[in-house]
UniProtKB/Swiss-Prot annotation:
Phylogenetic placement of the source organism: Bacteria, Pseudomonadati, Pseudomonadota, Alphaproteobacteria, Rickettsiales
CDD domains: SAICAR_synt_PurC
Enzymatic reactions: 5-amino-1-(5-phospho-D-ribosyl)imidazole-4-carboxylate + L-aspartate + ATP = (2S)-2-[5-amino-1-(5-phospho-beta-D-ribosyl)imidazole-4-carboxamido]succinate + ADP + phosphate + 2 H(+)
Protein name: Phosphoribosylaminoimidazole-succinocarboxamide synthase
Positions of transmembrane segments: none
Enzyme kind, highest EC tier: ligase
Keyword Ligase on entry: yes
BP-aspect Gene Ontology terms: 'de novo' IMP biosynthetic process; cobalamin biosynthetic process
Pathway participation: Purine metabolism; IMP biosynthesis via de novo pathway; 5-amino-1-(5-phospho-D-ribosyl)imidazole-4-carboxamide from 5-amino-1-(5-phospho-D-ribosyl)imidazole-4-carboxylate: step 1/2
Coiled coil: none
Length: 240
């Protein structure tokens, strides 16, 4: 890890300062957690795999004119990214019923949704990331009405691009979790933050429905590293 000061450390990544006040280093760790940290393990090289997969996807999104915080890959574990003020929301877009969505509505896992569904969650570990409505978001001033429309439009565009990308790799994009932030030097500009990797996407093999994401760890379904390497291989992501 860089010798510079760590200004934030989360469950799977650390954010490290740089000499430029408008950028930070995003460091990918090998830690993997589930059920709000109740389940925890260190899986060798997981951070390396996610770093490369996320960089690959962020570059694809930038080419599709999606604004992201990604600038460049620095090394096997780190990226240079734009410094943001993170909006405290997790934006989940669902294409297939899975996970908490099935429990909430008593729907069978695997049911295809007629169109993508967006859910918002307040990003707060102490409260276990509760689901929130658009009215909550407006009330707490996390987003304006115009910004919310922008985030939803961008989320659906990202989803469309990634559904196609993963489909070409014989993978279903079941759902994904996105985070957004405001540029530190231009608070009117909202961009995609965080990462896009098997840590925050549900990915199923199109033929066997085998899980290729963090559910492998959550549900004790096998070797997480092997699943993540399979995703990288199918996307033709070079790992070094």
């Amino acid at each position: 890890m860089s010798l510079n000061k760590t200004i934030y450390e989360g469950k799977a990544k650390a954010i490290i300062e740089t000499e430029d006040s408008s950028t930070v280093i995003q460091h990918f760790k090998d830690d993997v957690t589930a059920f709000n940290k109740e389940k925890y393990e260190i899986i060798e090289s997981k951070g390396i795999i996610n770093n490369h997969i996320s960089a690959f996807i962020m570059e694809k999104l930038e080419k599709a004119e999606i604004s992201t915080h990604f600038i460049k890959t620095l090394n096997e574990r780190e990226q240079l990214v734009k410094k943001l003020k993170i909006i405290p929301l997790e934006v989940v877009v669902r294409n297939v019923a899975a996970g908490s969505f099935c429990k909430r509505f008593n729907i069978k896992e695997g049911e295809r949704l007629a169109s993508p569904i967006i859910d918002f969650f307040y990003k707060n570990d102490d409260l276990a990331d509760p689901m929130v409505s658009e009215n909550h978001i407006l009330y707490f001033d996390w987003l304006s009405s115009k910004e919310m429309d922008e985030v939803k439009t961008t989320t659906l565009k990202i989803n469309e691009i990634l559904v196609h990308l993963f489909s070409n790799a014989s993978i279903y994009l079941v759902d994904l979790k996105l985070e957004f932030g405001r540029l530190i030097n231009d608070s009117t500009k909202i961009v995609l933050a965080d990462e896009i990797s098997p840590d925050n996407c549900r990915l199923w093999d199109k033929n066997t429905y085998k899980k290729l994401d963090k559910d492998v760890f959550r549900l004790n379904l096998g070797d997480l590293k092997e699943a993540y390497l399979e995703v990288a291989k199918r996307l033709s992501v070079k790992l070094g």
